[in-house]
Amino acid sequence: MIVGIGVDVVDIERFGRQLERTPGLRDRLFVPAERELNTRSLAARFAAKEAVAKVLGAPAGMNWQDCWIGLDQNGPTIQVKGTVLAVAESKGVKRWHLSMSHDGGIATATVLAEG
């Protein structure tokens, strides 16, 4: 059963400027394993986190580090803890599906939550 679908797009250049202008933003949005990635990859991961938030109804108290994008042999994976995990469990989410891409200055992510 599909619990929810979320989609988000991020302007890569604008996102990069925000990271440069705002000290500590990279640390607030990303876990240590994500922080060293290039701007295109960070923009796609932020789009994925936004898409997860949309699936869950943008839960109050959501910490951006409670959701991170890992990689395994099959591609990107969504990892959750804290508030994001609690809300996902309350909605019956058992499995996440993620597709990310970037082209023409735009990063995009689509998230499907399955129960």
Swiss-Prot record:
UniProt key word Metal-binding: yes
Molecular functions (GO terms): holo-[acyl-carrier-protein] synthase activity; magnesium ion binding
Binding site for Mg(2+): D8, E50
EC number(s) on file: 2.7.8.7
GO cellular component, one term: cytoplasm
GO annotation terms (biological process): fatty acid biosynthetic process
Family per record: Belongs to the P-Pant transferase superfamily. AcpS family.
Upper lineage: Bacteria, Bacillati, Actinomycetota, Actinomycetes, Micrococcales
The name this protein goes by in its record: Holo-[acyl-carrier-protein] synthase
Functional note: Transfers the 4'-phosphopantetheine moiety from coenzyme A to a Ser of acyl-carrier-protein.
EC class: transferase
Source organism: Arthrobacter sp. (strain FB24)
Annotated SUPFAM superfamilies: 4'-phosphopantetheinyl transferase
NCBIfam families the UniProt entry points to: pantethn_trn, PRK00070.3-2
Location relative to the cell: Cytoplasm
Keyword flag Protein biosynthesis: no
Reaction catalysed by this enzyme: apo-[ACP] + CoA = holo-[ACP] + adenosine 3',5'-bisphosphate + H(+)
